[in-house]
Amino acid sequence: MELRHLRYFVAVAEEGHITRAAERLGIQQPPLSQQIKAIESELGVQLFRRKARGVELTDAGKTFLEDARTTLSQLERAFEATRRTARGEQGRLCVGVTSTAPFHPLVPRAIRVFREACPMVSVTVEECLSNELIERLQGERMDVAFIRTSLSTRDGLVVNPLVKESMVVALPSVHVLAQGKRDAAIPFRRLANETFILYGPPGTGMYDATIAACQAAGFNPKVGNLGASTQQAPRIASTLSLVAAGLGVSCVPSSVQRMNMDGVVYRSLKGPAQPRALLSLASRRNDPSAVVRQFVNQFVNMVRKEAKGILSD
């Protein structure tokens, strides 16, 4: 028995008339009558009683109708689930973020819009440093990641630059530079004698951007592997905690100002050497997952539509 036989049987049962069922199915009446007889022959039972003006189900036919409808319904759900998966509208997606990425409004909005468009996709979000996110992507332990990196290419990955946002300096609230007007920008060179708390290890975008800005301003920041002036923090929360404790200052993306912490104030920077933090979306090159392609295409198209290219804040 084939799937079409179940559809033939259900159509005749619902119409109560072979001719009307044939019209509904788009086939001729004689072949449909033959198919119904073939089904009854295969089952070894009578499914319909012939009447003067149509047919009616026998008790055996009523039982078969219930199961036939269930089978067809289950198959239709399976077909639709398969189609959704092929379109990237069903499945799983693991999204990686650096601890600063969610502060930029694009990131939570991208995830929200995707979930609204593809509610059948199970989305999980994991937080790591950019270097760790890249390792997980390359190791196929993550699907996509919002990263802060100065590199536009990585082995086996596609890195889509999204946003270049200016960085601000986070200062202890008791710092002399924090006492001026809130909207007064600080010349970057005035940070030359400060102890810098760097976010992340060398090779991450914000670390490299801070070092480059200091050098462009004519000084080397007080950072290193030894000495009291050395401070590095793996997460933005720990970075700001060290700032609040008075252990130094830190350059952070301007969007991080949304994070209020007692003992920390933010000030914009001015001068020719202003650091900028690049936010990118990374994924594996030629990833076969339709869900990944759907997310990346949807997000990149959203950014391009809004900004005609890489965004600036």
Name the predicted role of every residue range.
Residues E40-D59:
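A short LG(V/I)-centered, amphipathic sequence patch enriched
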Residues H104-V107, A184-I186, E194-P221, S289, ...:
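Secondary-structure junction motif
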Residues V12-P31, G44:
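Short helix-boundary/capping micro-motifs
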Residues V158-P202, R276-N286, Q298-V300, R304:
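Hydrophobic/proline-rich hinge and linker segments of small-molecule sensing/allosteric domains
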Residues L129-L133, Q138-M142, R148, P201-R267:
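Hydrophobic hinge/microswitch elements
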